[in-house]
Curated annotation (Swiss-Prot):
Probable transcription factor. Required for MC motor neuron differentiation and function, including role in modulating pharyngeal pumping. Regulates gene expression of FMRFamide-like neuropeptide flp-2 in MC motor neurons. May act downstream of transcription factor pha-4. One of its GO terms (molecular function) is DNA binding. Residues 1-42 are annotated as: Disordered. It comes from Caenorhabditis elegans. Residues 94-153 bind DNA. This is Homeobox protein ceh-19. Coiled coil: none annotated. The keyword Ribonucleoprotein does not apply. GO terms for cellular component: nucleus. GO terms for biological process: positive regulation of gene expression. Its main location: nucleus. It is found in: Nucleus.
């Protein structure tokens, strides 16, 4: 039996009216349909495997990147799964209020941060006892301070690069920092010539 839309939409007759002939015919049709479905599945799997391997070979041959999940979904006509759940988050009333640090606490924390960006467990325990804060509060303060420090560092580097053609860094033109280092033999000769000039 051919698989098409009409066969699906046809109203099937009642098997009781047809009798045993229908059951025998139905069994043979089922076996035939199962064989056809299995054959179609094998053909589809074969095409899918071939298309996948050809796509991969094309990508390798042309030095292309692997497609992203979204690109594959668009290519295959599969929509992205929509999630109906939301991340659970503590309500505002359940959350602890922000820690208000005293000037003395902030000064000490800043001093420790300038000394070392990462605290040891012993140092954290000592600070918590000295400043009357919990270890978690100190740990969180240091994490936040490191984040701020990294942002400031990135910003200053960007500014330095932006101003590079006109400024110098420690007496060395910025452009020379971008050039490859001088080979050791030339550098040694240069250093020797400098010492020779001083004598």
């Amino acid at each position: 039996m051919a698989f098409n839309i009409e066969s699906l939409l046809e109203k099937k007759s009642n098997p009781v009216e047809e009798g045993n002939d229908f059951e025998e015919e139905n069994d043979s049709e089922k076996n035939g349909e199962e064989d056809e479905e299995e054959e179609e599945k094998n053909v589809i799997d074969g095409w899918t495997n071939m298309a996948t391997s050809q796509l991969a070979m094309f990508a390798i041959a042309n030095d292309l990147r692997t497609p992203t999940l979204v690109e594959l979904q668009m290519l295959l006509g599969v929509s992205a799964r929509k999630h109906d759940y939301k991340r659970s988050r503590k309500s505002v009333c359940e959350r602890k209020p922000r820690q208000a640090y005293s000037a003395r606490q902030l000064d000490r924390l800043e001093t420790e941060f300038q000394t070392d960006k990462y605290l040891s467990v012993n140092k954290r325990i000592q600070l918590s006892q000295t400043l009357n804060l919990t270890e978690t509060q100190i740990k969180t303060w240091f994490q936040n301070r490191r984040t701020k420090w990294k942002k400031q560092l990135t910003s200053s580097i960007r500014q330095m690069v932006k101003d590079a053609p006109t400024s110098t860094s420690v007496g060395v033109p910025f452009q020379s920092l971008l050039t490859p280092p001088t080979p050791p033999t030339t550098l040694a000769c240069h250093v020797n010539s400098l010492f020779a000039c001083e004598q």
